[in-house]
A protein has these predicted regions:
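Pyridoxal 5′-phosphate
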Residues: 1-379
Length: 379
């Protein structure tokens, strides 16, 4: 089997990730809920994960990291806890439904938003952003990279734009955390949301958000915190403010192991290999007749994603053939990013997405390219 659906979730992970999850399930109590060794051990595991994420993102302090179940929950926390009725937000047509649907729901409560568009290859048009700013604009919300095309957002440009207009910069890093270097301080990012089960190589059910020191977010969920139990209000200090209830300690132990492995290898090293694998695939299919490639795989900051269609064939059928005849795992369809598909003209057909990991090999890439070549000739 060749697994090329890493933009959905990474299947191959360092062995220490699984071991960390198993060890935590056997030994960890409830963090922050006692003074005996199992609960203290759990607290240490959570803190280690917090420290690892802070180091990876170059956050100023581990307390800037609050954990959640995934990037979707983290984005709901950020978007639901920062704005008031009448506020305006700028976002892009590249966004995943984990951004869009919270915004649509908040629109019912009076939130306003505008979409920055893309060109015919799905590339953001930064020069047009100034036209979207209104007197009540409060934030710019952008993806680190499109999960459909792989086109990356120039976060340096986004930061300059946001702070020139006094806006918060909120980044959905689901596709970039762990696979591209990110320095939240250097980039002036106010909130960055991440998921653990993709390039961070952790288990599903893990994720969270970085929150700039001094920025207060109204919690999405309140309840047990392990501290200040007689107070009627949930604690306001980070990260407790955004972490009501018992955390997923085994999952966070696995996430910590994944992130520590990434730090040991070097994010730049992993990024270079993933970029090379995607480039190799692109090189071997870009000139095929009957194959249309979406996005601009040659642009800087491109995620290790190549999306295509073969003729007018439904993308789901291509994905089915790749699995049934070649044992290649890819993702077809809309990828929870409807506005990007509208921009690309692929609402009906969808696209076939190939997404690469450090654990893929050149041999797998070449075998997959050969399969696409065969299908392009047959269909």
């Amino acid at each position: 089997m060749i697994y090329l659906d890493n933009a959905a979730t990474t299947l191959r992970k360092p062995p220490q990730v699984e071991q960390a999850v198993l060890d935590a399930m056997r030994t960890a109590g409830n963090p922050g809920r006692g003074a005996h060794e199992p609960t203290l051990h759990a607290s240490r595991l959570v803190y280690a994960a917090r420290c690892a994420m802070a180091k990876l993102l170059h956050a100023p302090d581990p307390s800037c990291i609050a954990f959640a179940a995934n990037a979707t929950e983290a984005l709901n926390i950020a978007l639901g806890g920062l704005f008031a009725p009448g506020d305006h937000i700028i976002t892009t047509v590249c966004e995943h439904n984990s951004v869009l649907r919270p915004l649509y729901r908040l629109r019912e409560q009076g939130l306003q938003f505008s979409f920055a568009g893309v060109d015919e290859r799905g590339r953001l048009q930064y020069d047009d952003w100034d036209k979207l700013v209104q007197p009540n604009t409060k934030a710019l919300v952008v993806t680190g990279a499109s999960n459909v095309t792989g086109n990356g957002t120039d976060l340096a440009k986004a930061s300059v734009f946001a702070h020139r207009h006094g806006l918060l910069l909120i980044v959905d890093a689901a596709q970039t955390a762990g696979s591209q270097p990110i320095d939240v301080q250097a980039l002036g990012i106010d909130v960055l949301c991440f998921t653990g089960h993709k390039a961070l190589l952790g288990p599903q059910g893990t994720g969270g958000l970085y929150v700039r020191p001094g920025l207060s977010i109204r919690p999405l969920v309140v309840g047990g915190s392990g501290v200040h139990s007689f107070d009627e209000q949930h604690p306001a200090q980070m990260p407790t403010a955004l972490e009501a209830g018992t955390l997923n300690v085994p999952g966070l132990a696995g996430l910590c192991a994944g992130v520590e492995w990434i730090l040991a290898q070097g994010v730049e090293t992993l990024c270079a290999k993933e970029t090379a694998l995607a480039a190799l695939f692109y090189k071997n299919i870009r000139d095929l007749p009957n194959v249309k490639i979406y996005g601009d795989p040659e642009m800087p900051l491109h995620a290790p994603i190549i999306s295509l269609n073969i003729g007018d064939e439904d993308s789901a059928r291509i994905a089915d053939i790749l699995w049934e005849d070649y044992s290649i795992c890819v993702r077809a369809g809309a990828h929870c990013a409807p506005l990007m598909h509208k921009a690309l003209g692929t609402v009906e057909q969808g696209v076939v997405r190939f997404s690469f990991s450090h654990f893929n090999t050149e041999a797998e890439v070449l075998q997959t390219a050969a399969a696409v070549q065969e299908l392009a000739q047959e269909i």
